[in-house]
Curated annotation (Swiss-Prot):
GO terms for cellular component: chloroplast nucleoid. It comes from the Eukaryota. This is Superoxide dismutase [Fe], chloroplastic. The gene is SODB. Destroys superoxide anion radicals which are normally produced within the cells and which are toxic to biological systems. GO terms for molecular function: metal ion binding; superoxide dismutase activity. Belongs to the iron/manganese superoxide dismutase family. Induction: By environmental conditions. Pfam families: Sod_Fe_C, Sod_Fe_N. Homodimer. PROSITE patterns: SOD_MN. It catalyses: 2 superoxide + 2 H(+) = H2O2 + O2.
Length: 202
């Protein structure tokens, strides 16, 4: 059975940028429901005992998702999202990550502009991602609807922002662009992104 993992920091650690009340609902209710429902869906099936990543790839079913896909992908996406943030985050990346951003987007500022635009223009519910394309050895921005993520495209996710309304509504109401800016300026963990890139390029 999959277990709901806590975020890698206390629930109030991202205040005032992301409130403990948002965590109460977003992690405590939404994320928990994805994990609980997934466990019910796979119990006693051939998916029981597989990793979350394997379940996502199998149930994506080449774009015709099977019933367990949404809960599996959302369970994975949320854990990845919590780990994409840290208290006193933001700032700029460094090292190989910054070099690749400069190479593939022209500059860090250009990347931020594109990432914010991808997150702001994802219609309805979904996610915006920085991903690594292993075949081309390049970074790419991806926006995905609902539960989808770059794993199903064969890419390695490096960073994500959740743009489902439940991610920001208690703190920002309908001001999605403000939430996205705060995420980039105050919350993103470039250390986490760098370590994911290192693993992807090893």
């Amino acid at each position: 059975k999959f277990e709901l993992q806590p975020p890698p920091y206390p629930m109030d650690a991202l205040e005032p940028h992301m409130s403990s009340r948002t965590f109460e609902f977003h992690w405590g209710k939404h994320h928990r429901a994805y994990v609980d429902n997934l466990n019910k869906q796979i119990d006693g099936t051939e998916l029981d005992g597989k990793t979350l990543e394997d379940i996502i790839l199998v149930t994506y079913n080449k774009g015709a998702p099977l019933p367990a896909f949404n809960n599996a992908a959302q369970a994975w996406n949320h854990q990845f999202f919590w780990e994409s943030m840290k208290p006193n985050g933001g700032g700029e990346p460094s090292g190989e990550l910054l070099e690749l951003i400069n190479r593939d987007f022209g500059s860090y500022d250009a990347f931020v502009k594109e990432f914010k635009a991808a997150a702001a223009t994802q219609f309805g519910s979904g996610w915006a991602w920085l991903a690594y394309k292993p075949e081309e050895k390049k970074l790419a921005l991806v926006k995905t609807p609902n539960a989808e993520n770059p794993l199903v495209l064969g890419y390695t996710p490096l960073l994500t922002i959740d743009v489902w309304e439940h991610a920001y509504y208690l703190d920002f109401q309908n001001r999605r662009p403000d939430y996205i800016s705060i995420f980039m300026e105050k919350l993103v963990s470039w250390e986490a992104v760098s370590s994911r890139l290192k693993a992807a390029t090893a």
